[in-house]
């Protein structure tokens, strides 16, 4: 199986749109040139195969370039919330063995002494770089410009580098991405994923979405520091020759504009996102026939939200439906989802192709249909481990009949047709599909 970067190489000469951001668009050909330039830049600045690099960025084009560039050179990516304070960033770097970090330049001014006194290497990104020269200049009226030194660099300068074609070989099953989550017990964990798990998820899109998605576009407003945003908002579309419409922060007006311009055809979101859209007059008057698919994951998705949204779609003669799914970061993200062809009210759908979901009792005995127990997930998208925590890993990745399964901590049952119905959590507050509850508010408002 290819690495994340290699999975895009078949589109190396494609003029199909890969990214939308603000008023700009980038083809796959342009994207991959930028990825190779970024790889050359990072290697020149001392990042090599096996290095752990902490990235602390919102959904920007450079975030995508760097994601695939770091994968191409064989680095491991520790992806962190972009609003994380500087001191906490240094803590997570220590926790994950990271010597390099890529950050927003907004952090530099107030933390200059902290960064300059550190033994780590820091790369700073101007978030306005992909807007206009005026936006970039206005940014520096508000924020201090990072002063380059032996250990402080301006990541935006990668564009001046030639493409790096010497790509490092890596085992697609080894740790390549670290995501931070509450784990299945609510205690903070670093979840180690592989290129194989992310690619295997992306390869299942044809079992979720009917027809060819080439040339279509997914709204990527959920953050890349969680599996839902990274796996389904960014990598899955690109893997399948579709575009990712990047948005740093949810904005109804921008979403409506992109729908009207046919730049968003698919949406993944949490309940609050769809509630906000339904309250927006612009959305209700938008060209909703441009929408093909809308997916929702969340704690206690109200049935009324799904029915209201689907009524609006029907009234606009849109083929889209709001389809509820389920997953967790330990399986990258979604492992079970309703589809247009297989849908049941109140259910989170059937398992994806290659994923096996069972419901078991406390003795790990499989339970019959309609009997509630703990949900277990088996398949090719599972995490490798909780980093540096073999005890917690052993409690979550359990051996059943010689195969590794994720013990989710979620209660539910399967009906006679294989649809999963969730009933709650065993030990803690219910967790959104691969995203902790706080995303419902902080990431959408």
Describe the predicted segments one by one:
Residues 63, 84, 92, 101-106, ...:
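AMP-binding/adenylate-forming catalytic core of the ANL superfamily
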Residues 44-45, 72-158:
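Structural core segment of the AMP-binding/adenylate-forming
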Residues 265-269, 278-344, 356:
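Gly/Ser/Thr-rich phosphate-binding loop
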Residues 343, 350-354, 365-397, 435-438:
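Conserved ATP/PPi-binding loop(s) of AMP-dependent carboxylate-activating enzymes
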Residues 27-29, 167, 176-200, 338:
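Conserved AMP-binding A3 loop
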Residues 199-217, 225-266, 276, 280:
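Conserved AMP-binding/adenylation subdomain of ANL enzymes
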Residues 144-180, 187, 210-217:
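Conserved pre-ATP/AMP-binding loop-to-beta segment of ANL
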Residues 21-24, 39-84, 221, 436:
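Conserved AMP-binding/adenylate-forming
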